[in-house]
Amino acid sequence: MTSYDLIVVGSGFFGLTVAERAASQLDKKVLIVERRNHLGGNAYSEAEPTTGIEVHKYGAHLFHTSNKRVWDYCNKFTDFTDYQHRVFAMHDGTAYQFPMGLGLINQFFGRYYSPDEARQLIKDQAGEFSPEEAQNLEEKAISLIGRPLYEAFIRDYTAKQWQTDPKELPAANITRLPVRYTFNNRYFNDTYEGLPVDGYAAWLENMADHDNIEVRLDTDWFEVREELRAESPDAPVVYTGPLDRYFDFAEGELGWRTLDFDLEVLNTGDFQGTPVMNYNDADVDYTRIHEFRHFHPERKDKYPKDKTVIMKEYSRFADKGDEPYYPINTPEDRTKLEAYRKLAAQESKDNKVLFGGRLGTYQYLDMHMAIASALSMFDNKLAPFWNEGKALEQERGH
């Protein structure tokens, strides 16, 4: 029987970061329990077997951060390419530069607008509603960018994402719709950006590659919990699975959106000429198409010249058993979340369980945010627990 100093449930970036820090910095023996048959949560990638093209199994994952500590930490486990993400939006048979900027505005309205002219144009078109008086998402969006751009690029895309007419969605769902008054069409504005040179799977495996870390794949925490906690009664648990599932849905199910993916290998060297194409119109039921060869142009000599891999992405509400991706966060969800946070705080006190990550805190986290949050938990909760005997407490709001 092996006794562990820490048990981590889930091997996404949050769980792996906590495990790696405990193992490498404090020489703790760590067990990672993972329900899936691979490490890395939704960031996992693998080679498509017939082409060798690296596929992001759960949708495109683009690494970007302005947090130097997070960037330096990640670089311990992988080198990054100089990839910069750019997106195009398909509307009415034309591909537009995205996000909204001078490129899109000039293309859509059919003439050159200077930055000042474009600002005035959007201001005039947005005057139909005031943001403060908007009654629903549609009115709020029009108050920010005007009706023409809203109807072309936001209305149908939002309806597909949420399976709901934007007139039925709350205005509070959007606080801003940024418009750039430059021709810069870089999707992210962060200081650091890139993709792992050898792929996500290699990066994730490097994080877990430590003598003090044991990983058990294909293992459901709820089936082994009692046995593992009995074997290591003093070990804290960091749980990164769904918060409501941990408490057996005692306060009701939290609402999530999920994604479905349709992977195809095509007999062409290039399908769409760009990594991601959004499909903004209602007559196409997917929200976007990923073409993975374009994420790694430096691999062009390794990838086949006559085949490509695309993945269509569809969005819908998650049912029980679906993979949860994005918190819906209705007022009802927030009420349930408050109740679950109280249960989580009590569980931390009574049973040394901390909750983290996207699923464990019911919040959308980019990869760099999950890593930063995990580093904070290690620094502020776990290290003081081991080094100073401080009690474990769940952070407020997490």
Locate the predicted segments by residue:
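Beta1/beta-strand and adjacent pyrophosphate-binding region of the FAD-binding site
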Residues: 2-14, 31
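Glycine-rich FAD pyrophosphate-binding loop
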Residues: 7, 20-49
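Short alpha-helical segment within the catalytic ATP-binding CA
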Residues: 17
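Short, well-ordered alpha-helices that flank and scaffold nucleotide-derived cofactor binding pockets
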Residues: 20, 24, 209, 376-379, ...
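Mid-domain catalytic core of redox enzymes
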Residues: 25, 219-346
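Dinucleotide-binding Rossmann-like beta1-alpha1 core, especially the glycine-rich loop
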Residues: 50-127
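Active-site/ligand-binding neighborhood in enzyme catalytic cores
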Residues: 92-97, 102-236
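C-terminal catalytic lobe of FAD-dependent flavoproteins
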Residues: 323-398
